[in-house]
Amino acid sequence: MKEIEKLKEEYPLLNKLIATEEVFWVNPNMEKYETAIKDSPLSEENVKDAEERLKRFASYIAKVFPETKETKGIIESPLLKIPSMKQALEKNYEQPILGELLLKCDSHLPISGSIKARGGIYEVLKHAEQLALQHGMLTEEDNYAILDSDTCREFFATYSIAVGSTGNLGLSIGIMSAKLGFNVTVHMSADAKQWKKDLLRSKGVNVIEYEADYSKAVEEGRRQADADPSCYFVDDENSHDLFLGYAVAASRLQKQLEELKIVVDEEHPLFVYLPCGVGGGPGGVAFGLKLLYKDNVHCFFAEPTHSPCMLIGLMTGLHDKIAVQDIGIDNVTDADGLAVGRPSGFVGKTMEPFLSGNYTVSDEELYRLLKELADTENIYLEPSALAGMIGPVKVCKEDAYLQKQQLMEKVQKGTHIVWGTGGSMVPEDVMNGYYKTGEALTILEK
């Protein structure tokens, strides 16, 4: 315990985090892009390689997931202006949001309805491609739609895939692996929602449930895979492939911004707010965006007050050597996708020089924001997906970051993108429950 007391002295913000109060933290270790990229374990080439692989698989995806036909097998989500929500935020928080506000609707990504459809599906496809190439089932010049055959499914059925998840990553890995023919096991933590487990089982996925939290589910998944040479483990805590699958989102977003005639340059900064669990999804997206927009994009991670694992890891520099439970935080939150007690050391160390900051948000606030977005824009997200929504308010209100980066004059001409990470697959009765909770909390507040 002495070490914790020492940490609290060194990082006074820890006291607020321990009290589960909402905090806003500016990253003192952020560097200029050109310096940061020199020490990065990943590069633009890695992201381009991932992008090319997804293009090779597009004909297969379009064939087996009819909902992707229109986009020719490219798994992408809309970018929407949300002016009514912007007005509501300004009114409710008595804070003008300088610049335009948009929502990136990964909540409505085809196949698995969350940001995890990016990294999760990509990693499974990469593994399938490697196996098929090794065994002469495929060449890179082939039309990958040939993988949709009994022969290929029977081949993949001799291999298995395992993953530990609080929910959404499990959905992506499970749905994609089962479609290819793999035997797939998803190790689900205690906070995983029942409907997610039911949906996976309906797709022929083996779901193993744990009483413990996310870290335990990952540990068990890793153990199972270690004992079986034909089993591939998707390691959410350390996976470069997941990270790169998420990073591909950046070039897609760039095209969408161009279509909307939104400029990003030194005079027109871009601010992006990303809900963060273990870190792979937001880390990958932020990394991809930094490669494209360099010092003109400012990325913030958003975490629940009861699971601020990445913030604690980054602030203390201990990364995955510290868990929220070590300092007396319970890691219990309704934002199930973000209910992670120990961050990814790989993501924390990779993103440390690129990340602008991090903030926390309470479950109550997430529910109120959920209701507000439904009322103003008729868009329904799951609670964890609303963590980014309060970001523009926090950045404009606590202007320490804007001052430090000399953005006070520029923010007005800038753009804020809130990353809506999941929600379209939530069953109607569950979503109605979320909405009612938001309604009750809004009445209470007033």
From Swiss-Prot:
Cofactor(s) listed: pyridoxal 5'-phosphate
Pfam name, any one: PALP
Gene Ontology MF terms: D-serine ammonia-lyase activity; hydro-lyase activity; pyridoxal phosphate binding
PTM sites of type N6-(pyridoxal phosphate)lysine: K116
EC number, as in UniProt: 4.3.1.18
Family matches, as PANTHER family: D-SERINE DEHYDRATASE, THREONINE DEHYDRATASE, MITOCHONDRIAL-RELATED
Protein family (similarity comment): Belongs to the serine/threonine dehydratase family. DsdA subfamily.
Name of this protein: Probable D-serine dehydratase
